């Protein structure tokens, strides 16, 4: 960032600071309800966490805490016969707010032990691998840029890739092994310009202003959340303000947006947002070879018919358009290399969903319906020259449409809670592909796909808590199937049992364990791949669900309500993973490039394993301080098709991950934060320069080929990065103004990749036959500094 720009911003902050008069105070209103029945709880205690300010609910469960200054808060609620509860963090800005609280019924003899309310949560179903991420961590995390995928990289077990990507590699798993839920509605991806068949991209889609909290599972996945092998991100969204209308504007370093929320009558609330990027101008100014533009929109409407029935309708959509910056004046060799292989990408995606909940005594019935569509287009021409049709090397167009119906039911009995449910889905996958390839000879892949798949599944979970809640156990089972082929249509072939245990050794010390078997359906790109004769190659190859057996054991120590330490060991075994027939490597080591993953012939023969140890300390918002310090020792290995007797490192075998991230709240609404991250060197496969130099080979691929006979035989150097952030929030009579400076990689550390080659355009043997002609290739060094600065102003 230019120093004059920085000085001007600091001067502006101080000038606005001097113009502020005395802050007003507001009220926090809400209702306390039984989590099972939805009935209001009268005379419950509600206090602002870590303060003495509070209130008692009236006979209808309503409460009001007045005289609260603007800022970020949590509420703590308790009542005899219920577990004490600390809410997610929320912001009180320039108006009163309404905040609902749900309390879970406690065991009959819980009053015999001392239970301290804490913002840290774990469940009987997921005592390991569950991290709850609050609003403030998303909002003010250094280097996070208010993007949940970047914030998650702070937690143990999560590796990251090169700059400008949000890929999630959790506990040694690949980027295609994650699932995402928005208030119970499954969404296909959470990133713009996402890699089809995986999950990564450069920028998040979800508006962070909508998020109340995120449950991040890296193990012990709930039986209701199927089709995941590495992680589940379960987003809990805020409701619209029940009291007053509010408007918010966001001006960032890369986008501009506006959102609104408020009441629609006495029983209905809403929130809606629209965002538009101007990254193409920024990237053009700093000389990047690609120019992305994105637009996204999001909404949520919630209607309460009565205390026993409620309906939520939500939607999320994005339009992405990435062009190549071929007209750059200063065309560096690195930019030439990127332009040589990067396709033009156009994507459209949306999800519409509805969640209906009915409270019946101590039971809860839920019905979830949704429809999602992802349209993806990738086009590439040789030397980016569109003047000649023969220069076309890739024309890929596909649609993924999913229609889903799911029911979830919770029954509460003495000491036992039962969760049962099922789902039925219909997916439509269409594809029109033209792609040039080169193996030992050039060839062209041309096919059209129109594939319809019915999918179904059932699950059940029984949760037990001892009379004093010293011991909890959860036994779950899930089964999935579909009509793609006879290898997948039997529920018993995908039977997925899981068991979780937790025991309190003493008041602050717990031992937790989990073991389970999990299944994941390969991506539609793999299911729908055809050969030139129109045959579903992978159906013939007996493609099946990917299977992973996982186990974990951990200790959790909570000396106070705001501090905890955890140590968790894990082991994951993979089986039936798709193995590329062309490359003889597992698809598990692919998926962090722009484009498509899985559109090739495979066999379900790859096996692998990931294992390691995670250590974490977390201090949560006490006396203004919040921090996470974590270290992960992880190994991720697979067997390739050339040597089935030896495990080789996967692309996510970083070995060592260390992160420290913290924020500190200063007087007068200042916040400062920092994040320091060390990522161990990732393995890589050297390029096959000889093969790549053939004219027919290079022109087909528009770039280099890997030498898979030396699969991941080399390793990059470790990478370190320091990010810092300064926030200032101003509260006026009717406006809240927030500004921040977020400087990523302030030490200008370089992420060094393996050297690459570019063609000079010269054929070194023009007299040879066409199939023997070679380009002259020149090596260049590639590194990324990822130095970025952000400023944002928001108005309410």
What do these predicted ranges mean?
Residues 21-112:
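Periplasm-facing N-terminal accessory domains of Gram-negative outer-membrane beta-barrel systems
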Residues 302-320, 342-488, 504, 563-566, ...:
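Face-selective signature of the C-terminal outer-membrane beta-barrel domain
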Residues 179, 213-224, 230-238, 245-289, ...:
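Predominantly transmembrane beta-strands of Gram-negative outer membrane beta-barrel pores used
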Residues 191, 327-334, 430-437, 507-550, ...:
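Surface-exposed extracellular loop regions of Gram-negative outer-membrane beta-barrel proteins
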Residues 465-468, 571-573, 592-686:
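Gram-negative outer-membrane beta-barrel transporters
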Residues 83, 89-93, 116, 120-222, ...:
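Periplasmic N-terminal accessory/gating domains of Gram-negative outer-membrane beta-barrel systems
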Residues 575, 669, 677-702, 716-721, ...:
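C-terminal beta-signal and adjacent terminal beta-strands/loops
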Residues 393-398, 402-408, 446-453, 457-459, ...:
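Outer membrane beta-barrel strand-and-loop segments of large Gram-negative receptors
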């Amino acid at each position: 960032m230019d120093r004059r720009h920085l000085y001007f911003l600091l001067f502006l902050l101080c000038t606005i600071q001097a113009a502020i008069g005395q802050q007003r105070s507001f009220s926090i209103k809400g209702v306390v309800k039984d989590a099972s029945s939805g009935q209001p709880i009268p005379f419950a205690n509600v206090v602002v966490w870590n303060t003495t300010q509070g209130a008692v609910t009236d006979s209808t469960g309503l409460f009001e805490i007045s005289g609260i200054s603007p800022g970020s808060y949590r509420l703590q609620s308790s009542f005899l016969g219920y577990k004490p509860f600390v809410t997610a963090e929320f912001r009180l800005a320039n108006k009163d707010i309404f905040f609902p609280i749900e309390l879970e019924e406690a065991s009959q003899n819980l009053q015999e032990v001392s239970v301290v309310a804490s913002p840290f949560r774990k469940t009987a179903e997921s005592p390991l691998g569950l991290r709850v991420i609050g609003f403030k961590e998303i909002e003010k995390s250094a280097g996070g840029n208010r993007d949940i995928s970047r914030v998650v990289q702070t937690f143990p077990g999560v590796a990251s890739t090169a700059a400008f990507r949000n890929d999630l590699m959790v506990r040694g798993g690949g980027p295609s092994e994650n699932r995402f839920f928005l208030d119970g509605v499954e969404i296909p991806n959470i990133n713009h310009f996402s890699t089809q068949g995986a999950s990564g991209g450069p920028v998040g889609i979800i508006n962070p202003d909508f998020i109340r909290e995120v449950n991040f599972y890296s193990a012990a996945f709930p039986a209701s959340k199927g089709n995941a092998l590495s992680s589940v991100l379960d987003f809990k969204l805020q409701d619209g303000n029940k009291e007053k209308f509010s408007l918010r504007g966001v001006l960032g370093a890369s986008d501009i947006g506006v959102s609104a929320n408020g009441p629609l009558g006495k029983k209905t609330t809403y929130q809606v947002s629209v965002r538009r990027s101007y990254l193409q101008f920024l990237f053009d100014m700093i000389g990047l070879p690609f120019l992305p533009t994105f637009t996204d929109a999001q909404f949520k409407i919630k209607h309460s018919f009565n205390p026993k029935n409620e309906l939520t309708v939500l939607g999320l959509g994005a339009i992405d358009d990435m062009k190549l910056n071929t007209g750059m004046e200063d065309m560096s060799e690195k930019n030439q290399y990127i332009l040589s292989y990067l396709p033009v990408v156009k994507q459209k995606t949306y999800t519409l969903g509805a969640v209906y909940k009915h409270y019946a005594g101590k039971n809860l019935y839920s019905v979830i319906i949704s429809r999602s569509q992802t349209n993806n287009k990738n086009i590439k021409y040789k030397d980016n020259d569109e003047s000649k049709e023969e220069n076309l090397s890739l024309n890929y167009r596909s649609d993924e449409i999913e229609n889903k119906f799911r029911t979830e039911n919770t029954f509460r009995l003495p000491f036992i809670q039962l969760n049962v449910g099922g789902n039925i889905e219909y997916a439509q996958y269409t594809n029109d592909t033209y792609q040039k390839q080169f193996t030992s000879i050039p060839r062209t892949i041309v096919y059209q796909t129109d594939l319809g798949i019915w999918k179904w599944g059932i699950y059940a979970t029984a949760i037990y808590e001892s009379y004093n809640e010293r011991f909890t156990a959860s036994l779950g089972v899930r089964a999935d199937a579909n009509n793609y082929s006879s290898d997948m249509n039997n529920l018993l072939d995908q039977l997925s049992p899981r068991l979780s245990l937790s025991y309190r050794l003493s008041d602050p010390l717990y031992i937790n364990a989990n073991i389970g078997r999990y299944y994941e359906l390969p991506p539609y790109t793999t299911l729908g791949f055809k050969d030139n004769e129109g045959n579903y190659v992978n159906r013939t190859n007996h493609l099946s669900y990917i299977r992973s057996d996982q186990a974990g054991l951990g200790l959790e120590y909570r000396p106070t309500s705001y501090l905890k330490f955890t140590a968790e060991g894990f082991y994951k075994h993979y089986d039936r993973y798709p193995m590329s027939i062309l490359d003889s490597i597992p698809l598990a080591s692919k998926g962090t490039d722009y484009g498509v993953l899985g559109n090739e012939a495979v066999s379900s023969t790859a096996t692998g394993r990931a294992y390691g140890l995670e250590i974490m300390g977390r201090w949560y918002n006490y006396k203004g301080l919040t921090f996470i310090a974590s270290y992960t020792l992880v190994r991720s290995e697979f067997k390739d098709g050339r040597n089935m007797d030896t495990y080789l490192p996967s692309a996510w075998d970083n070995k060592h991950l260390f992160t420290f991230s913290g924020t500190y709240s200063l007087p007068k609404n200042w916040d400062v934060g920092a994040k320091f991250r060390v990522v161990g060197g990732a393995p890589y496969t050297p390029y096959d320069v000889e093969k790549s130099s053939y004219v027919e080979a290079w022109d087909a691929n528009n770039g280099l080929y890997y030498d898979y006979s030396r699969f991941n035989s080399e390793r990059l150097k470790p990478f370190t990065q320091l990010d810092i952030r300064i926030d200032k929030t101003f509260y006026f009579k009717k406006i809240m103004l927030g500004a921040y400076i977020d400087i990523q990689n302030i030490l200008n550390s370089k992420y060094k990749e393996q050297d690459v080659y570019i063609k000079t355009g010269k054929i070194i043997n023009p007299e040879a036959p066409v199939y023997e002609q070679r380009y002259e290739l020149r090596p260049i060094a590639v590194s990324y500094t990822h130095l970025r600065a952000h400023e944002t102003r928001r108005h309410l």
